[in-house]
Amino acid sequence: MSRAYVVSQKETLTETKNIKDGLETKIDILPILPPEIMGELLLDSLVEKGYKKDPCGTSVTKEIDGVLIVVDGGGTVTAEIQEEVTVNTTITATGRSDEDYKDHHERAMSQINQKLEEQREQAKKIINDKIDEKRADITKTLEKVLATEKKNIDEAINDTTIKALKQKAAQLGEIISIEESGQDVTIRVKV
């Protein structure tokens, strides 16, 4: 009399990746005053826009939706997002033997190992696809935050230019009048 034996094996595959995306760019500021003063004015303008000054006072930072934006006094803007992603998937394989278990155990285990290897390859593709999806999501978040924050940085540059022009005018002579209309500024100086 023969019996059928069923052997199952289950594995969980886990992969953890640290995904980063970012960029660095340089902003141009008119050199109305010496670079260190222009840098201080820029950082002060960014603080008014919600940035936080670092303890050394050489840069400002702001974090939005996991994106860290750093602007230094030299006008270098760095934006970076970093996230750790863990993907799990479980695979199961079953092998059977219709003969005496002792004699055909190796054949059943061979079937299981072959099935598991095939499923591992499929699972790795699924894991890589999920990680690629997450990488695309992170990039979209970075682009969205930068598009929004560009307006604040542009406004800070304009504010910096206006403050620098006022200081330069005061150095040249007596300021008679200052008229501001939005981003337009008219300064009258008596030399």
Short names for language-model regions:
Residues 1-191:
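Interaction-mediating elements
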